Every structure is written in C-alpha cells, then in structure tokens.
Design a protein with these regions (language model features):
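Beta-strand-enriched accessory nucleic-acid recognition/scaffold domains that flank the catalytic cores
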Residues: 1-524, 530-531, 536-948
Length: 948
C-alpha cells in the first residue's frame, strides 16, 4: 500500500503580539498552508518548529512601534526560542514567520542575509504544493531569460520528471483515500479494529480508492505553477513540459530562467565567465532537488468588477451591460416565483443540471454532483423547497444574494473567461538539432480558447484604462503559419504535422492565454502563473471597440529597482515597514475620483497604486501626501459604502450620485429592478426542523458530549461577535470625537490618529475573526471525524440539541442560533439525510439540441420523443423517435458516425438511470425515478453569523 510522505503534515504555532509587546497563542487552523503540507521548508528540515507571529496592523506611535520591534527579536513559546526569518504575501496583514533559533542562520543564508529578500521570498518555502518530490540526482540548468525558449519566470520540466510527480500525486491521494476506507471499515458492524485484510481484500480496496481519486490526479497538456529548491537557492514560476529526448540532448531535467531564482541567481564569477564565452552548461547543477507542483491551468471564470465597468463607454453600458443585467434579474425573479432553483443554484455556484466534465475527468460514482458549500448541498438535495426557511441555509442564501446583487448593480454581473497567462516559448528537437524561440508572436496578438476574434485582456487590479489590453486572437492555422515561419528562420524544416504537435503541446495548453512578454508587461503581468480574463469582442463589441480607438495617456511599469541593502539584524524593523495593504483603499479612492469626474486625480493615483503593489517586492512606498490631498478633493462614491451589506433589503434603493458617476447611475437603474426576495417571515424556527434527521439512536452519554461541544462552539462564536461589536462602538465613538473637534486643528490631529487606530483595529479583527471561526469549524470537524460508525447517532443528538424549543431546562443550557454547528460537523450526512427525508430532487441533464415535448427514457438512458399520430383506423397511436442517449458512464450523444460509434457531445457525472416518462423544457430533460446526491467537499464552508 502506498505511503504518504512522513513529514506531510507539520503544524505551525499561531502567535500574536499586541501593541504592548505581549505574546499570546491564537487558535490554530488546520488548512494545508497552516500545516506546511508539501512545502520546501518541510523538505529541507523535517520536524522543524515553525510559528507565525501576527503584529498589530493599526498605526502605532513611536513607543508602541519600538516595543513591538523589540518583542520580535525575542519570541519564545513553550520554552522554545524562535527567530524571525521572513514573510509571505501575508506580510501586508502583519503576519510573519519564525523558526527555531538553531535554523535561523541556515535560512538567512538562502536569502543572502538580506532582510528585504527574506520578507519578499520566504513565502516560496512555505507555499503548499499539490505534490512534492525530492530528486536525488537531478540535472538542472539555469539560463538567461528567453534562452532555450524560456521567458520571465517560465521554465521547462522533462516529461519523465513530470510523470514521476504525477505518479507521486496519485500515490499520495490513494494512500489518503485508503486511510479513509480502512477507518470506515473498522467501524462497520461486525468488524474488529485490528482486523487484517487478505490480499484480495487489499486489492479490492486499493482499486476502489484509485477509482475515487482518479479525477484529482495531475493532468497533462497544462501549464504548471512550481516551487523548487536546489543547492542554497529557491525558485518559483511556471513550467511547460519538454520531451525526454530534448532533456537528454541538453543534459537537463529542469531548465530555469534566472528570473525564477529568488533572490536573483548570481552563479559565481567562473560560471559567469563560462557563460559569456558561450558555454551552455556554465550554470548547470547536478544533485538533490526538491520540486513541487502548486497549481495547474484550467478553464476559469471571473466576475465582472466596477473597476472594469468604470472604463466602459456609455453606449456599452446602455446596450451591452444593462440588458445582460436585466436578463439576469428577470431569470432570478421567474425562478423565485416558480420555485425553480435552476438560476438560483447557478448564483450559488451550483447547477440544476448535471455538471459537464472535462475530457478524461473521472468522478466519485457515489455522488451526482459536487457543491460549493454544505448550504448549497442542502438546497440541491431538498425535494420540498422548505430548506430555504432553515435559519442557517437562509442566512447563507441572503449573504450570497446580497453579494450577487452588489456585483450586479455595480458591474452588470457578467462573467468573463479566465486563464493562466502563458508565454509563446517553444523548444523542439528536429534531426538531432535543438531549435527554440521566445517572443515571436506579434505584440498585439494572443492565443486563447475563446470564439471572439478580438478582445481585451484584463488583469486585476486594474490601474487605468490602458491596462485593458486589446488583442487579436490567433486561429490554429495562423499560429501554425507563424510558428512554421519562425522555425524556417532558425533553419528548422519540420513537417506541418510535427509543427502542429508543437502548437498543441506547447502553445495551446488548456486554460492558458498566450502572449508576447512585452504585451504581458504592459498591465503588470509575467509568467509566474498570473491569472487574466478576457472581455470578448463578440459579446461586448462597443466596449472593445472603444478601447481600441482610445489614445493612451499614461504608462505604469513595475518598479524593479533593487532594494537598499540592510543588515540581517534589522529584520524586525523591515518586517514592521512591510505592514499595511493600501491596494484596496487606493483602488477605491481612484474609483471615487472617476465617479466625481476627476480623471486628473485618478491618474495621480495610478503610480501610487503601482507603488503599493511593488511595496513588498521592491520596497516602494505610496506617497501619503498625494493620497491625502486627493482624498481631501473628492467625496467617497456612495455605493462603495454598501459593499459589506449582508441582505439585499439593507442596500439603498436609490443613491445621490454625480452625472459623471457611471457606476452610481448603473446602480440606481438596476437596484430598483431587484426589489426584495425575502420577507421577515422567510425564516422558520429551528424547532420546525427537529424531525429532519432520523434513524440514529443515541445514548445519554452521546447527548451529553454533543451538548458540551455545542456550548463550547456557541461560547466562542458569541465572544467573537461581542468583541466585534465592542470594536465597532469604539470606532463610532472615535468618529464622533473627530467630528466634535472639527474646528480644533491641534486636538483633531491626535483624534484622527486614534480614529485611524480604531478603524485599523476593527478591520484587522474582521480578518482575524474569520480565521478564528474557520479554526473553530476545523476543531468541530476533527471532533466529528472521530465518530466513524456512530456518526448518525452523534448527528441525531446534536441536531436534537440545536433544534430544541428554547424553554428552561434544569439539566442542559441551550444557546439560540442558526443550527450551523450541525452542518459543519457532519456536512455530508446532513445533506444525505435531507435527500432521504424529503425525497430529493430528480437528476436533470441539459442537452440544448433537444426540442421541447414529452419523452420516454429507457434503462439504457436512450431518450425518445413521444409523437402522437392518427392511424387509418382513427385511433391515436404513439411513435418513439430517438433524440439522444445518456449512458451509464455519463456520455451524452445524439448521433453515431459511419462505423456506428457514438459521437460524444459531452460527459456529465454518471448517475443511476431509471426507465419512465418525462418532459423536455428548454433543452433540459429530467430523469424520472432518480435522486440527486450532492457531495460536499471538505473545507468548503460559509462562516457563521450567529452563535450555534
């Protein structure tokens, strides 16, 4: 049986310092990132003790700043001395990493004893990967960017090394699944905990585990984000796969551009001289290498944003964006009135129809769909519609709809296809010669799997209109023609068939948008797995045309000036300077400038936004005087204040906006169309759901244990909500004090500082409370995971406790709430019980080519249109006309080829098929006698908004 890496889970101690320098322990999360699962740091030093240290993010006076900096030099917990060693992207939120002091020097050496480099790049070592392996004898080659078909942060990995990663990934997944299956088996009736499997049982269990995880294994024909370490260096970026023949020719299993190595690769004087003299192997390394795959390209979907729509022309808003939004509102209204969840589930990230699968993708056969959260799963499984009234589900739904309504009213609510940004580099071997090239497609062209010929490439955050990059989408034939011409230029005369294979394997990878590096850099992109989306010219022709005709007025490039050197002992001071994330506030201030018709002020903020983006990497700082002066010139766009509303009913139906405020006018137009979707009577008491969970007998001991865990959960949530309310009141009082002294300049200065402290403290607590709630949910889930074999009993007891009438009870203290703990502790069991107790919802499959009408479905999944005709005897008869078939493997087809083989149109999640009569409406066919069984993946939760 395959084994998981021994050091696959390393817990991190979560600590925090207050402004007085007092150190305390935070609740520990169980996420992969918080356990260093599959990280480089774990690979270097198995068993190393690591702690995160959170510092205050609010403004500190000189004394408080010095106290916190001193405290960072002497972190001690449970008798272990820790030393600060760096940060990840979370430095902006005041979160830093510390390790046992004995490891400090070794880690500092990896960053050349530079505090700035450690603050910027330590995150490479603690980034959790999907899979990681150590290659004892790896051949690694470092080259200049764009040599051997590389580009900015984009390298090559050999096919055989990728297959090893793929095999290790599968091995890890199978081992984890086997552990689950064995745990379930031990708690089955009649089984003993020490039972041993015979060879046949072991093989059967391994086969079952393999079938359940096949769809999760790394797939080929993708773009891969990596983390890598060799010698005393670390690297990050993206890989394409090169053929093994090329790897042997170049004597390299991995090829890295220098830009991937962080801090930037130097290589020594002798290697540099050899490189200048043309020695391709000058920067070759052979030895132990740790390499991991962090992410894989796939088809993505981005939501529109007001930072995008504010650059749309008026005619696009009127004729393209508004009509799309109105159609969404009408579909939602109709679905709501008819109790049809199709559109509603789409808003929640689920689908009424069976989800379409990727080619070659496998799924867990026990479930008909995979939902985003347990609340979504409850709605999908419910056959009555009454679960909408459940306090927890209703609260979740209200929040989701409020977020959707805000997006709709401020950005039109449309969706954009998303991609990983990839380069055009290729590397081929033809007739024993190596041919390669980079940046050979024209600057204004791109390769993307969208039907539109023209489009705009969007990379968030959007600094200015110039960031919306117009591009022309190359067809397959055009890419092939350009590639053939470039190969010819380099003396390569491969066949069209071979060139087509290069296009397929290196240039049109799934889930990627391929660009020239100069084009990517125009809006701040590189090839370190940046993600972009596309405004399609076919759907938004006026928007795209307006940007193409626009005369650019400003250019903002990344500031890559080297950081000033600083000694290692200044690491705490550098850490405190890295705090603070102004990206969001500057972006919203820029938006307010545009809403007030002050385009000139918005342009002043473009460079400040870039400085904020470069703050951690390049040590730049936004000019606070510029920001302050702009803030004094413009008022905040009123619709920005509605961003955090939890219910549609709390969003103003009309706002006072300026004539130049495109988003404000769009909001006022769409908000009045939304109306209200929930009344005060929309929520039923928890006691209405007492009979929902049944069939699990429990003992008084189980009931008492569940009562204890419920009290603990409710107390923690209550404390968090109470503290949030206290901080909010402090902020309100600080605002009132500033307003009361608005004419006293001297007093106002101190009061403004305290107000800013209160505001930052409230914002920091909002983020921290989310982390603590997730940690609490993790604790509840760990408790529940130990109940294998008695899960239904514990679920029944816990459900009875939270749904009990709130009358006095001398033995048990019950806390009112939404019943959220039940959904978090036993998510899959709750959803399964809802499906069983309500009768569930039938499975539907969308086949757009089907015409509406009555259909008959047989046991093989064949769908026949029922046609009625009158025979010569005057009697009405039926004729069955074949329309389509959904096989038991989930294959959907409507016709066969000349050899009689089905032409597969798409694949859906397989489900048990029953024969019977049904109806087709709008291309949707419902299968009679079926029941949806949603799967709720672990870790997907909606945070509670109230105790219990």
């Amino acid at each position: 049986m395959p084994n998981v890496m021994e050091y696959s889970t390393m817990p991190i101690f979560a600590l925090e310092l207050d402004r007085d320098g007092h150190l305390s322990k935070k609740t520990m999360k169980l996420a992969r990132e918080e356990q260093l699962t599959n990280t480089l740091l774990q690979g270097f030093y198995p068993g190393i003790r690591v702690a995160t240290v959170d510092v205050p993010t609010e403004p500190l006076d000189a004394c408080e700043q010095a106290i916190v900096e001193q405290a960072l030099t002497r972190v001690e917990f449970d008798g272990i001395r820790y030393s600060l060693v760096g940060a990840s992207g979370s430095a902006k939120k005041g979160k830093f990493y510390a390790v046992e002091t004995k490891y400090e020097k070794r880690l500092a050496e990896r960053f050349r004893f530079s505090p700035q480099a450690a603050m910027t790049y330590f995150g490479i070592l603690v980034s959790s990967c999907k899979v990681m392996i150590e290659v004892p004898d790896c051949r690694l080659l470092v080259v200049e960017d764009r040599q051997l078909g590389t580009n900015d942060c984009r390298g090559w990995i050999s096919h055989s090394l990728f297959k090893r990663l793929q095999a290790k990934h599968r091995e890890d997944l199978v081992a984890q699944e086997m552990q689950k299956l064995l745990a379930n088996r031990k708690h089955c009736p009649g089984e003993h905990e020490d039972c041993q499997l015979n060879r046949e049982e072991q093989a059967t269990l391994e086969e079952r585990a393999g079938s359940k995880i096949d769809h999760k294994v790394l797939r080929g024909h993708r773009f891969y984000q990596f983390r890598l370490a060799f010698d005393k260096a670390q690297a990050k970026g993206s890989f394409k796969i090169m053929a093994d023949e090329l790897a042997e020719k170049l004597e390299a299993d991995v090829i890295l551009p220098k830009s991937s190595v962080k801090p930037r690769y130097q290589g020594g004087v002798l290697r540099t001289i050899r490189s200048i003299l043309g020695d391709r192997q000058a920067h070759a390394f052979r030895g132990s290498v740790l390499v991991g795959i962090r992410d894989v390209s796939r088809d993505l979907e981005f939501q529109s944003s007001y930072t995008l729509v504010e650059h749309a022309p008026d005619d696009s808003i009127e004729l393209e964006i508004k009509p799309n939004a109105l159609r969404q509102i009408e579909r939602l209204r109709k679905a709501w009135e008819e109790n049809n969840f199709t559109e509603l589930f789409e808003l929640l990230g689920t689908q009424e129809a069976q989800s379409v699968l990727d080619v070659g993708e496998d799924t867990d056969p026990e479930y008909t769909s995979s939902e985003y959260t347990v609340a979504d799963g409850a709605l999908v499984a419910d056959g009555t519609g009454y679960m909408l009234k459940h306090p927890f589900v209703n609260h979740h739904l209200q929040r989701v709809l409020a977020r959707w309504a805000y997006r709709l009213c401020t950005s039109g609510g449309f969706r954009l296809p998303g991609f990983a940004l990839a380069d055009d580099g290729y590397l081929v071997l033809d007739r024993g010669q190596v041919f390669c090239s980079s940046d050979w497609i024209p600057n204004d062209r791109g390769i993307a799997s969208v039907p539109s010929r023209q489009g705009l490439i969007v990379r968030y955050p959007i600094r200015m209109k110039e960031d919306l990059l117009p591009f022309e989408n190359l067809s397959v034939d055009e890419v092939l023609s350009l590639l053939s011409a470039d190969l010819e230029k380099h003396g390569c005369h491969m066949s069209d068939q071979q060139a087509a294979a290069v296009v397929d394997q290196q240039l049109r990878l799934k889930g990627t948008l391929t660009l020239h590096s100069e084009a990517a850099a125009r809006n701040g992109g590189d090839f370190d797995f940046d993600q972009v989306c596309v405004v399609e010219g076919d759907k938004f022709p006026r928007f795209v045309r307006d940007r193409i005709m626009y005369q650019e007025q400003h250019s903002a490039q990344k500031n890559k000036a080297p950081k000033p050197p600083s000694p290692w002992w200044n690491l705490p001071q550098v850490a405190m300077q890295a705090r603070g994330n102004q990206i969001g506030s500057i972006t919203d201030l820029k938006t307010s400038c545009l809403a007030n018709g002050r385009d000139d002020l918005a342009r002043q903020l473009v460079d400040q936004l870039q400085n904020a983006l470069d703050q951690l990497k390049h040590g730049t700082q936004p000019d606070q005087d510029v920001i302050r002066n702009v803030r004094n010139e413009v008022s905040k766009a009123p619709w920005l204040k509605l961003k955090q509303k939890q219910r549609i009913a709390d969003m103003d139906e009309h706002l006072p906006v300026t004539e130049r405020d495109k988003i404000g006018k769009l909001y006022n137009f769409l908000r009045k169309e939304l109306g209200r979707y929930f009344s005060d009577a929309a929520v039923a008491p928890l006691s209405d759901f007492r009979g929902l969970i049944g069939g699990g007998g429990f003992t008084p001991e189980i009931f008492a244990e569940c009562s204890t865990i419920n009290k603990y959960y409710a107390n923690v949530v209550t404390q968090i909500l109470s503290r949030r309310r206290e901080l909010w009141n402090e902020l309100e009082n600080a605002n009132a004090a500033v307003e009361a002294k608005k004419d006293d300049a001297e007093a106002r200065k101190e009061l403004l500082f305290r107000r800013n402290q209160a505001s930052a403290a409230y914002s920091a607590f909002e983020q921290r409370s989310k982390e603590e709630l997730r940690a609490l949910i993790d604790q509840v889930r760990v408790w529940a995971q130990g109940k294998n074999g008695t899960r239904l009993a514990y679920l029944s007891a816990l459900h009875a406790i939270v749904c009990r009438d709130r009358g006095p009870d001398p033995e048990h203290e019950f806390v009112p709430g939404t019943g959220s703990i039940v959904f978090y502790a036993f998510p899959q069991e709750v959803v399964d019980q809802i499906a069983a107790r309500t009768g569930g919802r039938p499975v539907s499959v969308e086949i757009p080519s089907l015409r509406d009408g009555e259909v008959e479905i047989d046991r093989e999944g064949r769908i026949f249109l029922v046609s009625h005709f009158v025979n010569g005897d005057g009697q009405v008869h039926e004729r069955l006309i074949f329309l389509a078939q959904v096989t038991r493997k989930g294959e959907v087809f409507c016709e066969r080829d000349a050899q009689g083989s089905p032409i597969i149109a798409e694949r859906v999640r397989p489900f048990p098929i029953e024969a019977g009569r049904s109806e087709v409406q709008g291309g949707m066919v419902t299968f009679p006698g079926t029941q949806r069984r949603p799967e709720v993946p672990k870790g997907r939760v909606a945070l509670p908004g109230s105790p219990n």
